[in-house]
Regions:
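Substrate-recognition/cap regions that form aromatic- and gly/pro-loop-enriched pockets
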Residues: 307-432
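Histidine-centered catalytic/metal-binding microenvironments
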Residues: 408-494
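Accessory, solvent-exposed terminal regions and/or long lumenal/extracellular loops of proteins
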Residues: 252-314, 318-323
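C-terminal membrane-anchoring or membrane-association module
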Residues: 515-533
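Core hydrophobic alpha-helical transmembrane segments of single-pass membrane proteins
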Residues: 507-517
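Short, well-ordered beta-strand elements within core beta-sheets of diverse protein domains
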Residues: 123-129
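A contiguous strand-loop segment
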Residues: 6-119, 139-275
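Juxtamembrane/start-of-transmembrane alpha-helix segments at the extracytoplasmic/lumenal side
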Residues: 494-509
Length: 533
């Protein structure tokens, strides 16, 4: 994962207008990166079955039963599953992960383990294996202790008892807290934990050598006379993290005293405002509105959505809503919604939410709409992700044609309608708590019907936007957009279209290359070359 990837947030239920807990994340990596939304069925595993992460070779024994769960995976499992977010059948929800990294001093003492636990496999291991959020934290802690972590990560995992915020800091060090109900947090790609009270075992889970490793690394730091986790483990704060945490805090609490150039930012914040689901959506769509800064992506960018070197301007900052967002999700967790239904709703925006709607889904759904399951790595009008990607690309490339914001306005109108409908659906799920099968069927039917109607409208919006561009710039402008999208994958093999011709071609090329290498080595030896060259 690049440094500029993913922004998470938590809003405790005592800060919300309706008493729900809000937890979410934008999943950021790169443009033109297809994502799916699926239901993974309960599986009775064979004895001795092993999970292997194709991304790095990490292995873990599968439990006797892998519980049913929803997931938002990548479409290239040979590069890692990246299930990312979902509910399991026991009402545990997870968002994993926000990438982060320890400083060089820490990594020399407790380095990351190449085949350790990584984001690519984390959700696929944890969510189908646990019945409570605490069990999930304890499972991750055990794995990191025994097998190590391949990278630093921040994870949120929740159930009816609350939300756990966990930082996997280095190869074998971690810390987690039960998040306070009267606080909110915004966290991009850096660690934020401060003083951790390890004596409070009900609300804290931490590795025993957390302080020891920092001292050995000579990076141990205190604040107010107490060991400070993030100050001890973090590298210097990156500009892309500063801009997102600052703008995120100000989005939720405009009167917050935080300043852009503060030396560091705390994890926990409070506000006199009563926050709503709309506030959470606005946070994930935030592009530095109301500040003196402008989004970096308004500058000329490279293929990763990053400004070209040497063209950085202090006015331009990296926003939460940026071209690298592949999907965004918000868990709206309510005390009264049964755990069997997930304990709440996951509002999912497939593709960047900048011009895309969030749709609500319970954790007990049995299937997802087909457009969420299209596997291609190239543009397809059958795909939810690619449809949204095309709409966002058109709006970004031709802002003068879409400056009225009509698409975003329509998305927000639909969301507001669904929020009202979802309150009624909550009551239905509560009434069906003793009939879980009927509740699942009801949730699935509602989700499918809404998705089908919405996708049809998104197709109309896409066609209208394409026509608007073609009328102004000609049909060649649309072909240019196709070429730009294809260029992002020109070196990748499309798994959907993969066939044995590729294998044969690769084999012939490999054999030819091997023959050339052998010939050169033999020739070199005959000319007196060193045997160990």
């Amino acid at each position: 994962q690049p440094v500029e990837a993913c922004t998470g947030f938590i809003i405790g239920k005592k800060l919300t207008a309706d008493g729900s807990t809000l937890v979410g994340r934008t999943e950021d990596l790169e443009p033109n990166h297809n994502k799916n939304f699926v239901v993974r069925e309960r599986v009775y595993n064979k004895k001795g079955a092993i999970f292997e992460d194709a991304a790095n070779g990490f292995q873990y024994p599968l439990p006797e039963i892998s519980y049913k769960y929803t997931a938002v995976p990548d479409v290239t499992p040979d590069q890692g599953i990246f299930d990312e977010a979902g509910f399991n059948e026991y009402g545990v929800s997870i968002s994993a992960t926000v990438s982060a990294s320890a400083n060089d001093k820490i990594q020399k003492v407790d380095p990351y383990v190449e085949d350790g636990l990584a984001e690519s496999g984390l959700t696929s291991i944890v969510l189908p294996s646990v019945k409570t959020a605490r069990e999930g934290v304890e499972l991750m802690a055990q794995i990191v202790r025994e097998q190590g972590a391949a990278e630093g990560n921040i994870i949120t995992i929740a159930d009816k008892t609350g939300v756990w915020y966990m930082e996997i800091l280095s190869g074998h060090q971690y810390a987690a807290i039960l998040f306070p109900e009267d606080r909110f947090a915004v966290f991009p790609n850096t660690f934020f934990l401060g003083h951790v009270d390890v004596s409070d075992t009900e609300r804290t889970i931490a590795s025993k050598d957390l302080e020891t490793v920092a001292k050995k690394a000579n990076s141990y730091k205190e604040m107010d006379g107490k060991f400070h986790v993030s100050q001890s483990y973090n590298p210097p704060l990156q500009e892309a993290d500063r801009s997102r945490v600052w703008s995120g805090i100000k989005s939720l609490d405009p009167s917050s005293p935080v300043k852009y150039d503060d030396a560091s930012f705390d994890l926990l914040h409070t506000t006199d405002r009563k926050l709503t689901l709309r506030d959470a959506m606005n946070l994930q769509r935030n592009r530095l509105e109301g500040t003196k800064y402008k989004p970096q992506d308004q500058m000329e960018l490279d293929g990763k959505g990053i400004p070209k070197k040497g063209e950085f301007d202090a006015v331009y900052k990296y926003p939460i809503s940026n071209p690298n967002v592949m999907e965004a999700h918000i868990f709206q967790l309510k005390d009264e919604v049964p755990a069997s239904a997930g304990g709440g709703t996951m509002w999912l925006s497939m593709g960047s939410p900048r011009n895309a709607p969030y749709l609500p889904y319970y954790g007990n759904i049995l299937n997802t709409y087909q457009a969420y399951q299209e596997l291609g790595n190239h543009y397809s009008e059958r795909s939810w992700y690619w449809t949204i990607s095309r709409i966002n690309d058109l709006v970004a490339k031709y802002p003068d044609l879409f400056e009225d914001g009509a698409i975003r306005t329509e998305m927000e109108r639909l969301e507001s309608q669904w929020m009202v409908e979802q309150d009624l659906s909550d009551k239905e799920q509560i009434a069906l708590a003793s009939q879980p099968e009927e509740a699942s069927m009801k949730a699935t039917e509602e989700g499918m019907a809404r998705a089908e109607k919405t996708f049809q409208r998104l197709q109309e919006i896409r066609k209208e936007a394409e026509q608007k561009v073609a009328d102004k710039h000609g049909k060649s402008a649309l072909q240019d957009l196709d070429d730009e999208e294809d260029a992002a994958y020109e070196e990748q093999i499309d798994l959907v279209d993969f066939d044995y011709d590729y294998i044969l071609a690769a084999g012939l090329f490999g054999a030819t290359l091997l023959a050339i290498v052998i010939y050169l080595i033999r020739t070199k030896k005959q000319k007196g070359g060193k045997q160990d060259d």
